Amino acid sequence: MSTKKIIIDPITRIEGHLRIEVEIDENNVVTEAWASGQLFRGIETILKGRDPRDSGLIAQRICGVCTNVHYRASISAVEAAYGIEIPHNAEIIRNLVTLSLFVQDHIVHYYHLHSLDFVDITSALSADCAQAAEDAQIWCEHPYRNSDGHLEAIKEKLEGFVKAGRLGLFANGYWGHETYRLSPEENLVHMNHYLEALRIQRELSKAVAIFAGKTPHPQNLVVGGVTSVADMLNPQRLNDFLFIIKETRDFIERAYIPDMLMIVNAYRDSIKEGEGRAVGNFMCCGGYRFGKQQQLFENGVIKGHNFENIEPFDPSKITEEASRSWYENDAPLSPYDGETTPFYTDLNEDGSLKTEGKYTWVKAPRYDGNVMEVGPLARMIVGYVKNSPVIRPYMERFMKRSHMELIDFSTTIGRNAARAVEAQICCDYLFDTMSDLIENIKYYDETTWTKYVFEELPSEARGAGIFEVPRGVLGHFVR
């Protein structure tokens, strides 16, 4: 059997630091695949010997998209090491910022990173705008910005891009390919929401900045709490935040969820065939408290799609595997004992990866020796299986409308659907989280920082900050 190797370097949709090599057979089926992180970060090396209170500001430079979560996890790891408990208001403000990032990231991930794998922009140019407006009502009684006139304006804008030869980021699509399933009218509806999502994500950045100071790379976290005191006590700032979240919720309910229902319907056969299904190991660490005793996400571990058996999450079972990574130590180690000593072995003479040895700068995390899937799909499945009073009602509603079963979410389309459902949940529960803050302020609880004397803290300590974040589970371990 003859094989062909394809190399894609860089994968531009994830900031350009990933290389993929695949081998395909004569039927164009992928038989082997290797992923290689091509950038040495070295954040651990940079942090060694520094004041632990600075760890968050430095660690968040790992990524310009998900900066807040690295900032928070690093700060929380230091707090855990020193046994510092932050005030409830500080936890609320941290949750407001992080959950806003969840919603923004999910909208960007679907519309601006993934949707054009399903949506043919050139097909939208032949759409009947009146029919498009009517088709949108199949999935939502009152679709988002759905007038004939507005859709005509969107169509004219797209036509202008094409006629002027200024497709820009749309220039390299496989437009017209037979695997696109949407009608011209459905493509136009999607492109309408694609462009609207650009505005929504900009507004969500403003919401994050209200409490975080700025984004990316916010500045509001310190060991022991937050610095957003003036913003927390300013009614106008609170109203500005809520206004953006209300507008975002409207977009999710009248655009994002209906668009996912449309995609599920169009690609139902690929769902039933299990396209994109992985090994079925799901892991969640849980978290995000609101109200008295409730939390947004459940913790749990499911293996092999066995939804009848769910284990509690145990962070001590996490290890980092480096046998294929460009580091000296090959053994799987606890993150507390992890080593980041580079050992670069280069590529083959023809420029391909040395797939029999080391070929990436990225370590491979394992849970009890197993590969695990984390992120929206894992959280929605674990929450559903554990009968979460938060997650299960949203999942059941989407499953009823989409005619999906739980196993159907463990597919490429299903992951996108899970992300949309989670965006809706996070957006709704931002209001509950804000209510907790307002309730505390009403009863004169304005505490945002736990006082401590740094010089009196232990000279040796270790701690971990492990969180659910938009695209998975994030752990920062400090010693």
Locations of the language-model features?
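A translation/RNA-centric and nucleic-acid-associated enzymatic feature enriched
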Residues: 476-478
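Active-site bordering "gate/hinge" segments
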Residues: 1-473
